[in-house]
């Protein structure tokens, strides 16, 4: 019985730590670019406090470059999580459909991230029974397809009409850990492939500024202990588009 009680905190910490993932997906960059010289920038935050920054620049009428970043620092009694990531990429965009109000974007890129997670098992008096400290770096490659429509639907809110745009993105992320430590002991690295479908809605405040709500899922194609699909995408933010040519 005594041995069982000693093992219980360790077992509970393992269960707790396996419920979340080293990898926290960022908000996909969905700039909805239309013309050369256009700049898009967005800032988003999730309920867990994951802050994301996305930017894009249309180098030509069909080619764009991207830069993204994410940062999270969440501290609680039983769990502290620190996570940061940067990405760069580029790709193709094209407008089509009635009045060219539909946009297809195909991007690819690479990035890197750092994860620092501390799990604590506490007793009824909040005394620490055990600690599990996990640190890892990881490399990321991704390919992403965005489809969006600039056809405007209307939402009446507080007596004011706001236009709405909709879009979806499907991202495939290839993640590999390196320098993965648990309690200062080097661990075998893990890899996984994540499918990340995302849907977003934009509320138009002006020609340049929109509010964006994003929701999506995260599916891991491989079974892994620590690099799993333990996090989804749910955020609100704002997007700015500058340099867009006016409609003729």
Q: Predicted segments — roles?
A:
Residues 31-48, 53, 60-77, 102-108, ...:
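Transmembrane beta-strand segments that form the barrel wall of outer-membrane beta-barrel proteins
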Residues 15-18:
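C-terminal motif of bacterial Sec signal peptides marking the signal peptidase cleavage site
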Residues 30-32, 51-69, 83-97, 141-151, ...:
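Feature captures outer-membrane beta-barrel proteins of Gram-negative bacteria and organelles
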Residues 115-248:
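Outer-membrane beta-barrel transmembrane domain signature
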Residues 1-8:
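Bacterial N-terminal signal peptides that target proteins for export
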């Amino acid at each position: 019985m005594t041995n069982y009680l000693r093992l219980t905190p360790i077992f509970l910490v393992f269960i707790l730590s396996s419920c979340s993932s080293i990898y926290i997906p960022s908000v996909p960059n969905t700039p909805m670019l239309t013309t050369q010289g256009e700049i898009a920038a967005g800032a988003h935050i999730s309920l867990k406090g994951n802050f994301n920054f996305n930017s894009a620049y249309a180098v030509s009428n069909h080619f764009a470059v991207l830069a993204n970043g994410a940062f999270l620092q969440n501290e609680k009694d039983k769990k502290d999580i620190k996570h940061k990531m940067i990405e760069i990429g580029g790709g193709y965009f094209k407008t089509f459909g009635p009045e060219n109000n539909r946009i297809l974007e195909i991007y690819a890129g690479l990035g890197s991230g750092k994860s620092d997670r501390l799990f604590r098992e506490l007793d009824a008096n909040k005394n620490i029974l055990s600690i599990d400290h996990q640190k890892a770096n990881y490399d990321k490659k991704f390919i992403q397809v965005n489809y969006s429509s600039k056809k405007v639907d209307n939402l009446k809110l507080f007596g004011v009409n706001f236009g709405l745009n909709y879009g979806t993105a499907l991202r495939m992320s290839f993640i590999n850990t390196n320098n993965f430590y648990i309690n200062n002991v080097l661990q075998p690295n893990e890899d996984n492939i994540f499918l990340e479908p995302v849907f977003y809605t934009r509320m138009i405040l002006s020609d340049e500024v929109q509010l964006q709500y994003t929701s999506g899922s995260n599916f891991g194609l491989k079974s892994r202990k620590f690099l799993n699909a333990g996090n989804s995408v749910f955020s609100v933010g704002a997007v700015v588009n500058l340099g867009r040519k006016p409609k003729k």
